[in-house]
Amino acid sequence: MELVVTSRETGKKSFLKKIRQQGGIPAVVYSAGKSLANITVDALVFKKFLSNLESGALSSTVFSLSYEGRIIKALVKDIQYQITTYDVIHLDFEELVEDRPVKLNIPIRCINAVDCIGVKLGGSLRQVIRAVRVVCKPKDIVPFLELDVRSVGLSQTRKLSDIKIPAGIETITPLKEVAITVSRR
């Protein structure tokens, strides 16, 4: 996802309030734990992007931030919402550097759920874990991990170890954890 961002002033809360009133979202880009740039993201563009995004996929979405003539590859590390309207009021991005590993959550997508044996026999498929915490280099980031549930029968489970993890990705979440279960209704 490409975002055109602009530089912003730092300091008082009144600056941030003015940015929000003008249709922007204040944001900070961090690199190696230190603030790299204070920026503004267009609120309408970001809101439209979020509305089209699959649930849980924001954590593994790589953004290309067009900032002062250069492109910064980054992940959203924190997002703050307004309590009553649920509008985004602040973003934290983490810059991706080629040789520096990054920790992130990659969502799990269950495939072939319609063909699941346990569901066809009247069971209910429940996804226990929605994302896996991993560490990998930026070039190895994938948007989601697939778990094939076609062969899962009634009263059976699949663990994280049943997910095919691509090369270059190391899991932090223990692989013995149950990812999905099919139970009787």
Curated annotation (Swiss-Prot):
Keywords, comma-separated and alphabetical: Ribonucleoprotein, Ribosomal protein, RNA-binding, rRNA-binding
Listed SUPFAM superfamilies: Ribosomal protein L25-like
Biological process according to GO: translation
InterPro entries linked: Rbsml_bL25/Gln-tRNA_synth_N, Ribosomal_bL25/Gln-tRNA_synth, Ribosomal_bL25_b-dom, Ribosomal_bL25_C, Ribosomal_bL25_long, Ribosomal_L25_dom, Ribosomal_uL5_bac-type
MF-aspect GO terms: 5S rRNA binding; structural constituent of ribosome
Family: Belongs to the bacterial ribosomal protein bL25 family. CTC subfamily.
Top-level taxon: Bacteria
PANTHER family xrefs: RIBOSOMAL PROTEIN L25/GLN-TRNA SYNTHETASE, ANTI-CODON-BINDING DOMAIN-CONTAINING PROTEIN (PTHR33284), RIBOSOMAL PROTEIN L25_GLN-TRNA SYNTHETASE, ANTI-CODON-BINDING DOMAIN-CONTAINING PROTEIN (PTHR33284:SF1)
Name the record gives this protein: Large ribosomal subunit protein bL25
Job of this protein: This is one of the proteins that binds to the 5S RNA in the ribosome where it forms part of the central protuberance.
Subunit details: Part of the 50S ribosomal subunit; part of the 5S rRNA/L5/L18/L25 subcomplex. Contacts the 5S rRNA. Binds to the 5S rRNA independently of L5 and L18.
Keyword Disulfide bond assigned: no
Record-level GO cellular component terms: cytosolic large ribosomal subunit
Gene this protein is translated from: rplY
CDD domains: Ribosomal_L25_TL5_CTC (cd00495)
